[in-house]
């Protein structure tokens, strides 16, 4: 028998054994959750095939299998979480038990074998690495005046572009991407770029290539042995990562050569400083050494996730403002009353603009940027609710389902910022335990504070000056997203009309 046939037969027998092993009590007591039908080798893939909007497919399957159910991705046992009660148990109550990450071909390529924060295995080294990242962000980053100035600088540049193109149908996506990219580049590398800069264009190209290929859920992540065959998507991913790594290495080398410890210019300097401090303060325990690769992949995490996610949330916000002009008008009225036109918005204005804050929160709820959170892995035999979960199970939290639970949200598909306001009109940060836009617990998003700063300042600056409208000759753009690494917005154009009040202020 040919070697490949032997391998396939062995895999089929292994899957059949695992499937039979997994059966038993599946709906009550201490048994596992009910599972989708599964076949040897392929598992439950046939149940998911033909459904590109995976988050919606998993959301609807709970009508048949309950809010917590299992399925098989090839030989991998996966538990799907659709309720906030189970989500909070996984993320908070039993965060350490579910702190693992799956090792896949794609994530190993993205993180150089798990040397980053997002995909690394949970353990002493990961905890030490995350602690240093928090220290670096505190040293240069989250909430700092310097970072606010950077965001305001890019917001002003964005407004200049909109002003030059006012009354024209404009695709805002490239401009939003440039603005957010410059914020993250300034944070990480102390550099920013003008439109058309070759290095900037290379960043955009490799970032989009990574997003496009990872979004396709390559079969090699389910069946790693498929790597022996030609794979166009995997080849493209490797080419994009080669460009990414060359750019990161160039920046890192420049920083190491210039680093003196007296001046911290950016996050990369801060990471070098906190690593040096940790090494000088006490001898590191064996296995806790952070290599240059760890620092590079950490910066790569912040850059990659920080650009794509925040840009996507901004695009969704603009899209919903086109669909709900009354919301946009109310934000502008609030800004006119509380801030006026004589000065620019600042982060300190957030308590003065509760309706803008509520609008941002509602956008994060109704279109979660990551409808399926990065999968967790159970590090020991454990449970979720009344159900047993074996060690090594992959746990997928369907944030779309959590944010559209009719038991928690009245008319969840309706865009209503008012659900994030109290009776006095003040912003409620979390009106329901079913609100988890950045995850929670041990694996909570590192960029939450930065993202909230950017969302507030970019929207405040733009709406103080412009009214965003759909071009008259075009229909309102679709609110249907495209599932992928992020919930992507379909392309649309917008007309940024200079507000009469702001025009008058400019004349004065």
UniProtKB/Swiss-Prot annotation:
Its cofactor is heme. Pathway: Lipid metabolism; steroid biosynthesis. One of its GO terms (cellular component) is membrane. Its EC number is 1.14.14.19, 1.14.14.32. PROSITE patterns: CYTOCHROME_P450 (PS00086). Keywords: Heme, Iron, Lipid metabolism, Lyase, Membrane, Metal-binding, Monooxygenase, Oxidoreductase, Steroidogenesis. It catalyses: a C21-steroid + reduced [NADPH--hemoprotein reductase] + O2 = a 17alpha-hydroxy-C21-steroid + oxidized [NADPH--hemoprotein reductase] + H2O + H(+); 17alpha-hydroxyprogesterone + reduced [NADPH--hemoprotein reductase] + O2 = androst-4-ene-3,17-dione + acetate + oxidized [NADPH--hemoprotein reductase] + H2O + 2 H(+); 17alpha-hydroxypregnenolone + reduced [NADPH--hemoprotein reductase] + O2 = 3beta-hydroxyandrost-5-en-17-one + acetate + oxidized [NADPH--hemoprotein reductase] + H2O + 2 H(+). InterPro entries: Cyt_P450 (IPR001128), Cyt_P450_CS (IPR017972), Cyt_P450_E_grp-I (IPR002401), Cyt_P450_sf (IPR036396). One of its GO terms (molecular function) is steroid 17-alpha-monooxygenase activity. It is an enzyme of class 1 (oxidoreductase). It is found in: Membrane. GO terms for biological process: hormone biosynthetic process; progesterone metabolic process; steroid biosynthetic process; steroid metabolic process. Heme binds at residue 445. Conversion of pregnenolone and progesterone to their 17-alpha-hydroxylated products and subsequently to dehydroepiandrosterone (DHEA) and androstenedione. Catalyzes both the 17-alpha-hydroxylation and the 17,20-lyase reaction. Belongs to the cytochrome P450 family. This is Steroid 17-alpha-hydroxylase/17,20 lyase. It comes from Gallus gallus (Chicken).
């Amino acid at each position: 028998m040919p070697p490949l046939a032997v391998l396939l037969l062995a895999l089929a027998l292994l899957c059949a054994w695992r499937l039979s092993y997994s059966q038993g009590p599946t709906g009550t007591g201490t048994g596992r959750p009910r599972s989708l039908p599964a076949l040897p080798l392929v598992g439950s893939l046939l149940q998911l095939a033909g459904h590109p909007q995976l988050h919606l497919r998993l959301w609807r399957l709970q009508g048949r299998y309950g809010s917590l159910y299992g399925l098989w991705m090839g030989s991998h046992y996966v538990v799907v979480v659709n309720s906030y009660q189970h989500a909070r148990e996984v993320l908070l109550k039993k965060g350490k038990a579910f702190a693992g990450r799956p090792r896949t071909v794609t994530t190993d390529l993205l993180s150089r074998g798990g040397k980053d924060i997002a995909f690394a295995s949970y353990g002493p080294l990961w905890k030490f690495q995350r602690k240093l990242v928090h220290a670096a962000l505190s040293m240069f980053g989250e909430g700092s005046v310097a970072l606010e100035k950077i965001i305001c600088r890019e917001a002003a540049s964005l407004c200049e572009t909109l002003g030059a193109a006012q009354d024209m149908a404009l695709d805002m996506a490239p401009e939003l991407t440039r603005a957010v990219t410059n914020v993250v580049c300034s944070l990480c590398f102390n550099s920013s770029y003008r439109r058309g800069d070759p290095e900037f264009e290379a960043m955009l190209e490799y970032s989009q290539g990574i997003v496009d290929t990872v979004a396709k859920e390559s079969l090699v992540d389910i069946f790693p042995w498929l790597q022996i065959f030609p794979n166009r998507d995997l080849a493209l991913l490797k080419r994009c990562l080669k460009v990414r790594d060359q750019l990161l290495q160039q920046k890192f080398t420049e920083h190491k050569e210039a680093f003196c410890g007296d001046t911290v210019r950016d996050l990369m300097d801060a990471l070098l400083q906190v690593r040096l401090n940790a090494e000088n303060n006490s001898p590191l325990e064996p296995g806790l050494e952070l290599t240059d690769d760890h620092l590079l992949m950490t910066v790569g995490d912040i850059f990659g996730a920080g650009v794509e996610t925040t840009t996507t949330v901004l695009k969704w916000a603009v899209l919903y403002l086109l669909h709900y002009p009354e919301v946009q008008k109310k934000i502008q009225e609030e800004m006119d009353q509380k801030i006026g036109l004589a000065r620019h918005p600042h982060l300190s204005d957030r308590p003065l603009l509760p309706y803008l804050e509520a609008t941002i929160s509602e956008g994060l709820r109704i279109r979660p940027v990551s409808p399926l959170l990065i999968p967790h892995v159970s590090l020991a035999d454990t449970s979720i609710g009344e159900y047993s979960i074996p060690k090594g199970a992959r746990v997928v939290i369907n944030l779309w389902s959590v944010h559209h639970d009719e038991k928690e949200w009245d008319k969840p598909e309706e865009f209503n910022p008012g659900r994030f306001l109290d009776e006095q009109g003040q912003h409620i940060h979390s009106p329901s335990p079913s609100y988890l836009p950045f995850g929670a617990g041990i694996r909570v998003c590192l960029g939450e504070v930065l993202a909230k700063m950017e969302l507030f300042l970019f929207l405040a600056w733009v709406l103080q000056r412009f009214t965003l409208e759909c071009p008259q000759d075009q229909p309102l753009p679709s609110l249907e997203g495209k599932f992928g690494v992020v919930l992507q917005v379909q392309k649309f154009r917008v007309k940024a009309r200079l507000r009469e009040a702001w025009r008058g202020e400019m004349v004065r």
